[in-house]
From Swiss-Prot:
It comes from Fundulus parvipinnis (California killifish). It is found in: Cytoplasm. GO terms for molecular function: L-lactate dehydrogenase activity. This is L-lactate dehydrogenase B chain. Keywords: Cytoplasm, NAD, Oxidoreductase. Pathway: Fermentation; pyruvate fermentation to lactate; (S)-lactate from pyruvate: step 1/1. It comes from the Eukaryota. GO terms for biological process: lactate metabolic process. Belongs to the LDH/MDH superfamily. LDH family. NCBIfam families: L-LDH-NAD. SUPFAM superfamilies: LDH C-terminal domain-like, NAD(P)-binding Rossmann-fold domains.
Length: 322
């Protein structure tokens, strides 16, 4: 007596929502677990050069598949395992040391990407790539150049996390939940990021209308300190625990959801901004982007003040200088 009788003659269906995570360090695994817990893929592939660590993480996840809604977790140092990925999340690279700026990491990580990106494209030519490794804006540009993909399919996690930190800190001061505070941080993910004070609001009430000095040195409420805290927060967490991983993991899962579920939600992520806000170079930095099944479906042109546009250009110049 046979236990299971196959009915479909063909071999197994190819996955429809396969997600690959490249790099199984602290950030890669936080992204992986966040994506799994939100049921965003039907197959998950992991890739890394450290074979033992990779196999260990794979086995550990497989042992918990009973508690998840994903049927298959695979891993290998060979990129063949990533074939047919819909989305590839790149977290590989060398990590920021305590006190090291994100931009200092550039050359070390560009070399890593030269090995990774062509392999991804070889096995998943139709994928969308989400770059998380720092300095994310520069590496997203590098990925775009190395991959040959159209610009809408190469996305950097950008200031999605900076905006989340900003919204959390501002909301905390106001005694409300972060989701009820609307605020955007644009530009570089890092030291020259731009807080859009002109667009900060709660329940449709614009904060700059209530306090025209908001975010400036003359602000009695010292809101400028909140943005400084956003910029400094990663450095502080790294100083305390050695790395940041949970918040970026949640942030990446949120972006993943908008892409694989074709949600057309707006997120501040890194995209090619040439010819926007008077930026002439092919530089990647964060603007509000509509994320859907095709990647960045469109860019929302925010009405910024002259000072904010100037800061954005400065952000672009900093990045292009690299």
């Amino acid at each position: 007596q046979k236990l299971i009788t196959p009915l479909a003659s063909s071999s197994a269906e190819p996955p429809r929502n396969k997600v690959t995570v490249v790099g199984v360090g602290q950030v890669g695994m936080a992204c992986t677990v966040s994506i799994l817990l939100r049921d965003l893929c039907d197959e998950l592939a992991l890739v890394d050069v450290m074979e033992d660590r990779l196999k260990g993480e794979m086995m550990d996840l497989q042992h918990g598949l009973l508690f998840l809604k994903t049927s298959k977790v695979v891993a290998d140092k060979d990129y063949a395992v990533t074939a047919n990925s819909r989305l590839v999340v790149v977290t590989a690279g060398v990590r920021q040391q305590e006190g090291e700026s994100r931009l200092n990491l550039v050359q070390r990580n560009v070399n890593v990407f030269k090995c990774i990106i062509p392999q991804i494209i070889k096995y998943s030519p139709n994928c969308t790539i989400l770059v998380v490794s720092n300095p994310v804006d520069v590496l997203t540009y590098v990925t775009w150049k190395l991959s040959g993909l159209p610009k809408h399919r190469v996305i950097g996690s950008g200031t999605n996390l900076d905006s989340a930190r900003f919204r959390y800190m501002m909301a905390e001061r106001l005694g409300i939940h972060a989701s009820s505070f609307s605020g955007w941080v644009l530009g570089e993910h890092g030291d020259t990021s731009v807080p859009v004070w002109s667009g900060a609001s709660v329940a449709g009430v614009n904060l700059q209308k209530l306090n025209p000095a908001i975010g400036t040195d003359g602000d009695k409420e010292q809101r400028k300190a909140t943005h400084k805290a956003v910029v400094d927060s990663a450095y502080e967490v790294i100083k305390l625990k050695g790395y940041t991983n949970w918040a970026i993991g949640f942030s990446v899962a949120d972006l993943t959801e908008s892409i694989v579920k074709n949600l057309s939600r707006v997120h501040p992520v890194s995209t090619m901004v040439k010819d926007m806000f008077g930026i002439g170079e092919e530089v990647f930095l964060s603007l509000p982007c509509v994320l859907n099944g095709s990647g960045v479906g469109s860019v929302v042109y925010m009405t910024l003040t002259d000072a904010e546009v100037a800061q954005l250009k400065k952000s672009a110049d900093t990045l292009w200088g690299i």
